[in-house]
Amino acid sequence: MDSFSRLSIFCLFISLLPLFSSPALLFQGFNWESSKKGGWYNSLKNSIPDLANAGITHVWLPPPSQSVSPEGYLPGRLYDLDASKYGSKNELKSLIAAFHEKGIKCLADIVINHRTAERKDGRGIYCIFEGGTPDSRQDWGPSFICRDDTAYSDGTGNNDSGEGYDAAPDIDHLNPQVQRELSEWMNWLKTEIGFDGWRFDFVKGYAPSISKIYMEQTKPDFAVGEKWDSISYGQDGKPNYNQDSHRGALVNWVESAGGAITAFDFTTKGILQAAVQGELWRLIDPNGKPPGMIGVKPENAVTFIDNHDTGSTQRLWPFPSDKVMQGYAYILTHPGTPSIFYDHFFDWGLKEQIAKLSSIRLRNGINEKSTVKIMASEGDLYVAKIDNKIMVKIGPKMDLGNLIPSNLHVATSGQDYAVWE
């Protein structure tokens, strides 16, 4: 093989790796009610010292643009950051600068599958968009809406490349102008506002090849996509033991999107929140690996306990509230990139317990590709060794036999969990 061929293969290998180079620890810096509290950007500043002390490397901020819904998930004038219910454009820039001073990078919540229009067209349909600038950027019409979104489209756009969305017009992401102007906007969020990366909302709404385009054209420091599909359930209403199809779909999406993006590990969340309810046998797959995405492609998996949708006041798929720390004991000791939720850290009084776990992770160098050796996985007990450095126990069972070597000491513990190092 000549040197050019070797270089080409090396470059291809590098391009398929996630963009972040050092172990990341993500924090979701808002909940479903944050937009209603007034001045969220300014109030979040007060949290920065605690987040820095907990080893947070990236904070996920809410959608920054003008939106019909106060939470930001029905955006319209994408460049208009002064109309956000979370605060002004300058307040956002100041917040990001304050995070940067502590070495914490900021992710914007990118909501681009759909978009709300500014006014009606001649048919009386809301499908005339404005970008929020004095010029014509993102001033789109009905031809920029997916053809099969018949409630809004004029029938001249492309068919939707993903799943439909009923609450607002589905944008035609196969349109080169859409791709160009959305990429320009995201790059503006980086250069003008200071964002470092992205959390992509509802990535099922367009083909993964579209996500690849936006990744290539904006080159974020870190990016994660929300591909939320239901796990499979049995007739008893409980999750099926085998969720390989579910985690396989996440892996396929990541690879189809170019391999440089991560995905929220909804598989691990679904299994874990069932497992902590006396079914810890779920936490090992037939190959002896973790059963979620972290068991097959951990370097591209972002693990979490809850977010603004699953938890908060929406509670669409909440983790058992009395088992949350068992959940954090799992994700903060295991591979993947863990994400900590604002509510748990600040509102639930769990800051110290979570910070102890994150410090153990940091000082032992546990990262997204760490190895896991599962020592026990039964109804009331889960024990695993990570990187041959630390051991974690989850569950009420106290008799561990000889599972924990005598040279390890308890680094932290709580209700039905403990970590040794």
From Swiss-Prot:
Instruction: Give me the residues that bind substrate, please.
Output: 73-74, 199-204, 228, 230, 255, 289, 308, 314, 393, 420
- InterPro entries linked: A-amylase_bs_C, A-amylase_pln, Alpha_amylase, Glyco_hydro_13_cat_dom, Glyco_hydro_b, Glycoside_hydrolase_SF
Positions marked as site (Transition state stabilizer): 309
What would be the name of the gene that encodes this protein?
AMY1.1
Name any Gene Ontology BP term: carbohydrate metabolic process
* Other noteworthy facts: Binds starch not only at the active site, but also via accessory binding sites on the protein surface that are important for efficient binding to starch granules and thereby increase enzyme activity.
Q: What is this protein called?
A: Alpha-amylase
Q: What is the lineage of its organism?
A: Eukaryota, Viridiplantae, Streptophyta, Embryophyta, Tracheophyta
Cofactors needed by this protein, per the record, are: Ca(2+)
PANTHER family from the entry? ALPHA-AMYLASE
Q: Where is the signal peptide?
A: 1-23
Keyword entries, A-Z = Calcium, Carbohydrate metabolism, Glycosidase, Hydrolase, Metal-binding, Signal
For this protein, what is any one GO molecular function term?
Answer: alpha-amylase activity
Q: Which cysteines are joined by disulfide bonds?
A: none
Q: Which organism is it from?
A: Vigna mungo
**Gene3D superfamilies, from UniProt?**
Glycosidases, Golgi alpha-mannosidase II
Residues reported to bind Ca(2+) 2 = 130, 133, 135, 139
- What EC class does the entry list? hydrolase
